[in-house]
Amino acid sequence: MSQVDAEGVVDGLRRTYISGKTKSYEWRVSQLKALLKITTHHDKEVVEALRADLKKPEHEAYVHEIFMVSNACKSALKELHQWMKPQKVKTSLATYPSSAEIVSEPLGVVLVITAWNYPFLLALDPMIGAIAAGNCVVLKPSEIAPATSALLAKLLNQYVDTSAIRVVEGAVPEMQALLDQRWDKIFYTGSSKVGQIVLSSAAKHLTPVVLELGGKCPTVVDANIDLKVAARRIISWKWSGNSGQTCISPDYIITTEENAPKLVDAIKCELESFYGKDPLKSQDMSSIINERQFERMTGLLDDKKVSDKIVYGGQSDKSNLKIAPTILLDVSEDSSVMSEEIFGPLLPIITVGKIEECYKIIASKPKPLAAYLFTNDKKRTEEFVSNVSAGGITINDIALHFLEPRLPFGGVGESGMGSYHGKFSFDAFSHKKSVLKRSFGGEVAARYPPYAPWKLHFMEAILQGDIFGLLKAWLGWSS
C-alpha cells in the first residue's frame, strides 16, 4: 500500500463519518449483527485458519476466540441502547438553575492494529467497541497469521458496510503507510517495541492511543493450597493457552524453597495427564507461530544459565515448530529467560525463603499486564492486591479477569495504556462530551461589571455552594 492508497482509504471513511451514517443506533446494530453472523456462519473456516497459522486445537479456537467474539457481540447488542443514552449528572449552585449530562460521541475514523497470537479475537474484539461507539474503522490484521488475516479480509468485505469499515492486509510498508495518516484513535495490540513505533507516529498528530502490550506476568504460589487444582489452572493458560504465546500467560512462578518440589511434581503429573508422555505428538497443543520465534525460544534454553535448570521437558520438534512444556527450577534472575518476556512454553520457577519476598522480585521488573496469586490466606490476598502493580490480577486462577466483560482489561506502565472490554470498549472509542443547559432566567448581577465587594462575596458563596454565605452577601453583611 502506497501513501496515496492509504490517504484514499482514510479520506473515503472520513466522508462516510461526516455524513453521519455511522452515528445511528440502527447502523451500529446492523454492523454488530454482521460480525455475529461471521462467528455463527463461518466458525469452521475460522477454526481451519487458526489451525493453519498456529496449529491451534479446535477446542481453543472456539473457547478462546470464536465464543469470546460472539459473546462480546451479543453483550454489545444487548447493552448498546443503554450505553448510548446521555448520562444525567447533578448540577451545583454555581450553575443553578440548569441541567447537565454527559453525551457519548464517536471519535471519528479509528485504526485497529492486531496481534498474531489470537488473530481472530484480537481483531474483532476492539472493533466491536469501535463500531458500537459509532466510528468508521480500518482493521490492520497481523501478516504473521496470514490465513486468519486473509479470512478476516474476505468475511468482513462480505458482511460489513465497506463504506465505513475497511480491512488493510500487508506487512511493514502497509502498516507504516497507515500510521502516517491522521486518525482519531489508534488501538494497537502487540509487542512493546512496535508499540513505541505506534506511539511515536500517533504523537505527530496528537492522536490518542490504546496500547495492549505485555510483560513478565508473575504467578505466586503459596504453601498449604490444593496444588493439583493450582497446577491444572496454571497449565490451562500457560500451555493450553496457545503454548504460552499469550500476553497474560504466567511468565514465571515464585514459591518457597520448601513448596517448589511439590509444585513441580503436581505440574508434571497434570501435564502428563493432559498431553501424555510425549507432548510433542499431542494434537491438543498449539505450535510456535514461526521459525523465528521457535529459534528465539530454543535459544533461551541454550543459555548456560538455563540449560542445566530444566527439570521437565526441554524437547523440541523444529519440523512442526513445537516445544514441549518445559519447567525450569531456580534459574538465575539475570538469565535471558528472566530478562525478557518469554511468550512461549517455558516456565521458570523462582524459589524464596519466605513468600513475602515475592514483592521485591516483582517490583524489580516493569509492571506486568497481569499477576496471579494462589493462596488460602485472605490477608495475603489483600497484601498482594495492595503491593503488586499490574494491569489486572486474578486470585486462585489464571487470566479469568480477562473473561469478565464488566472488568476493564488493559496494562499499566510498560505493559500498556488504556483499557477495553464490554462498556470499556465503547468508552475507549467515545468522547465524553459535557453538556450543560440553562434557560434565559436566573440572571445573577454579581457576575457582571461594575464589580463591587458584595459581588465578590456573592460569587465566592455561589462557587463554594455556601447558602448561608450567599444570604450574607445578598444582605450586604461583611464576613
Curated annotation (Swiss-Prot):
> What does the UniProt keyword field contain?
Amyloplast, Chloroplast, NAD, Oxidoreductase, Plastid, Stress response
What function is annotated for this protein?
Oxidizes nonanal, propionaldehyde and acetaldehyde in vitro, in the following decreasing order of reactivity: nonanal, propionaldehyde, acetaldehyde.
**Family per UniProt?**
Belongs to the aldehyde dehydrogenase family.
Report the protein name in the record: Aldehyde dehydrogenase
Lineage of origin: Eukaryota, Viridiplantae, Streptophyta, Embryophyta, Tracheophyta
Output the superkingdom of the source species.
Answer: Eukaryota
Q: What induces it?
A: By abscisic acid (ABA) and dehydration.
Q: One GO CC term of this entry? A: chloroplast
Xref: InterPro entries = Ald_DH/histidinol_DH (IPR016161), Ald_DH_C (IPR016163), Ald_DH_N (IPR016162), Aldehyde_DH_dom (IPR015590), Aldehyde_DH_NAD(P) (IPR012394)
Single Gene Ontology BP annotation? aldehyde metabolic process
- A GO MF label: aldehyde dehydrogenase (NAD+) activity
The record's subcellular location field reads: Plastid, Amyloplast; Plastid, Chloroplast
Active site located where? E212 (proton acceptor), C247 (nucleophile)
* Annotated organism of origin: Craterostigma plantagineum (Blue gem)
Q: Give the stretches traversing the membrane.
A: none
Q: Which reaction does it catalyse?
A: an aldehyde + NAD(+) + H2O = a carboxylate + NADH + 2 H(+)
| Gene3D superfamilies referenced in this protein's UniProt entry, alphabetically | Aldehyde Dehydrogenase, Chain A, domain 1, Aldehyde Dehydrogenase, Chain A, domain 2
Indicate where this protein is primarily found: plastid
* Binding of NAD(+), residues: G190, S191, S192, K193, V194, G195
Record-marked site positions (Transition state stabilizer): N117
Q: What is its EC number?
A: 1.2.1.3
